[in-house]
Regions:
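Single conserved hydrophobic/aromatic residue that forms the stacking wall/gate
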Residues: 2-13, 307, 312-317
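Conserved Class I SAM-dependent methyltransferase catalytic core
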Residues: 200-256, 269
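Conserved beta-strand segments of alpha/beta enzyme cores
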Residues: 141, 163, 246-249
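Conserved proline-anchored active-site loop of SAM-dependent methyltransferases
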Residues: 102-111, 117-132, 167-197, 210-214, ...
Length: 317
C-alpha cells in the first residue's frame, strides 16, 4: 500500500543524522531491489526518512577531515552515476516539511478541491503524496516526476499505486489539459532546461509555464518557488502567466521554513487557477506589476503584500 508520511523531516535535521538516515534508506532500497520484491511496511518507514543531500555537501568532499568515513562509504555504496547525481544535488535537493504540505492541502480544500488527477512535477520521494488527506486520496490519481534515479526508485516503493516517471519534467509528454491540481516544490536556479516548447525560461519559471499548460481549465497550480518569481523587476513572465491563469493568492514563507532541510532560501507558495479561455478580460492584474523598493533585503519587490502576504496561514486563502 502507499506510504503515509507522519514524521517531520525535522526528526533528522542534523547533518550527521540526515546522512545516516539517507544511507540506511539506500541500503534498504538496494536490498529490496536485489531480492526483486516490493518494500514491506517496515522498510517503507525506513525509505520515508530519505531526504536528499541538500545541506550535506561535506560528505562528498574528500578534504573534509570529519567526513572522511562518510565520503568513503558513499563511494563504495553508490554507482558512479548515482554518486555524481547525489553530489550535484547538494545545492538543489531540499525537501518540504509536512506542516507546509498539509497547509497547502487545507488551502486547496478551502478552494473546493476534493480529489482528481494530481501531478507533482518535481516529487522527490513523494512527501506531497504522503501527506495527501485521506478523503482527497480516495478520489485522486497520483502522477509524479523525479529526475534522480535513487530518489525516484524510493518513491516508487513508497507509492506503488502512483504513476511515477524517472526523468526530468522537460522530458515528459503529458497532454495539455490533463490535471486538476499540480502541486509541489519546484527547483530553482539560474539555468534553463532543454525543452524546445519552452526554451526561454529559467528553471523555476519553466515549471510554472509548463504546469499551467498541463492543467485542465479551472485546474489549480499550487507550487513552492523562490521569491524571484514574484520579486523580479522584469514582469514579462508574470504578464505571460496572467494571460492563462488567475492568481488566487500566495504566502511568503519565513526564511527559516526550510532550515531543517539545509537551506534558508526565501520562498513563496503561489496559487493559480487556469482560465477557461486565455486572455479573459475584466480581471485584477495588479499582482503582475513590480515596483522598485529600496531596503535592506532587496532592491526590487513585486506587487504589494495585499497580494503576497508574508507569513499568513494558508487557511486564510
Amino acid at each position: 500500500r502507499d506510504r503515509s508520511v507522519s514524521r517531520g523531516l525535522g526528526d533528522v535535521y542534523k547533518r550527521q543524522a540526515k546522512y545516516t538516515a539517507n544511507v540506511t534508506a539506500i541500503k534498504t532500497l538496494k536490498q529490496i531491489e536485489s531480492e526483486h520484491r516490493h518494500a514491506t511496511a517496515e522498510e517503507q518507514d525506513i525509505l520515508a526518512h530519505y531526504s536528499g543531500w541538500g545541506g550535506i555537501a561535506d560528505a562528498f568532499d574528500s578534504s573534509k577531515e570529519n567526513w572522511r568515513r562518510e565520503y568513503a562509504e558513499l563511494k563504495d555504496l553508490l554507482t558512479d552515476k548515482e554518486y555524481s547525481a547525489a553530489r550535484e544535488s547538494t545545492l538543489t535537493a531540499f525537501y518540504t516539511e509536512p506542516y507546509i504540505i498539509k497547509s497547502i492541502y487545507t488551502a486547496l480544500e478551502n478552494m473546493g478541491f476534493t480529489g482528481g488527477e494530481i501531478l507533482d512535477p518535481a516529487m522527490g520521494t513523494g512527501n506531497f503524496f504522503g501527506n495527501l488527506p485521506a478523503k482527497m486520496a480516495e478520489n485522486s490519481r497520483l502522477y509524479g516526476v523525479e529526475l534522480d534515479s535513487l530518489t525516484a526508485r524510493i518513491a516508487k516503493e513508497l507509492y506503488p499505486e502512483a504513476k511515477i516517471q524517472n526523468r526530468g519534467f522537460e522530458r515528459t509528454k503529458f497532454e495539455n489539459g490533463t490535471f486538476d491540481v499540480i502541486i509541489g516544490n519546484v527547483p530553482f536556479g539560474d539555468f534553463k532546461p532543454y525543452d524546445p516548447e519552452y526554451d526561454e525560461y529559467l528553471i523555476h519559471d519553466y515549471f510554472f509555464a509548463k504546469s499551467i499548460d498541463k492543467l485542465k481549465p479551472g485546474g489549480i497550480m499550487a507550487l513552492i518557488t523562490s521569491a524571484g518569481t514574484m520579486d523580479k523587476y522584469d514582469d514579462s513572465f508574470r504578464r505571460e502567466l496572467s494571460g492563462k491563469a488567475d492568481f488566487l493568492g500566495g504566502v511568503r514563507l519565513p526564511e527559516d521554513a526550510f532550515r531543517t532541510a539545509g537551506t534558508q532560501t526565501v520562498t513563496d507558495i503561489l496559487f493559480f487557477q487556469k482560465l477557461e479561455f486565455e486572455h479573459e478580460n475584466d480581471r485584477n492584474l495588479d499582482w503582475v506589476r513590480s515596483e522598485r523598493v529600496y531596503g535592506e533585503a532587496s532592491v526590487f519587490q513585486a506587487v504589494s503584500y495585499t497580494h503576497l502576504r508574508a507569513h499568513e496561514t494558508l487557511s486564510d486563502l
